């Protein structure tokens, strides 16, 4: 696909469904990875499954100190960070009138604030190297909204706007910042849904099916590549035509 040999990447939420597909896509193209997540045992098992000389760097994105320590820890193990993939995120769904403060705060803290802190830390070595790729996984919900997800929509919409601002700040240093916005992606959670519910979801998608994690991984691998060097401040929507934006 795209040759990432000699490049290094830090990926958050690495062992989840979409995160693992992203890591596999980057590793397949030759990148060396620092995989991050909060479940240490699961993370280490995933790192081992990738083969090669990839490294694991655990992090609790809900804890400020843990977030602040992540980029330095990855730099220590990798030597440099060419690619930052902000994939980790959470949901705490509820109707706005019933949403508790902690449900709002948790989503904003992990999805938006932690990503800001990681971007801030990673941009410094990228600017010094005059090369970098920042790729943030957002969501179609960040553009269209979704009932019961005011907190999640706000966090993902905020990531998109923040990416555009950072892209303008870093462009002159050959550092790009872009988003990939998935629609409905098949995961272990969606597989457990009743057939009628899956059929209803698929009916909303012109392509008639959910996407795969590999679809997101391919988009990330492209944006991480040297070939994507003239693309910045953009969002690639990967949703089977569900929302044509």
Residue ranges and their predicted role:
Residues 8, 15-16:
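Conserved glycine-rich cofactor-binding loop
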Residues 95-96, 100-108, 190, 201:
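Substrate-binding pocket helix/loop in short-chain dehydrogenase/reductase
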Residues 119, 155, 163:
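Active-site helix of classical SDR
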Residues 124, 168-172, 229:
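Alpha-helical segment proximal to the catalytic Tyr-Lys
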Residues 139:
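Residue(s) in the substrate-gating loop at a strand-loop-helix junction
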Residues 171, 176, 231-233, 239:
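Short, small/polar-rich loop/turn modules that mediate ligand/substrate recognition or access, typified
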Residues 205-216, 227:
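A conserved structural motif in NAD(P)-dependent oxidoreductases
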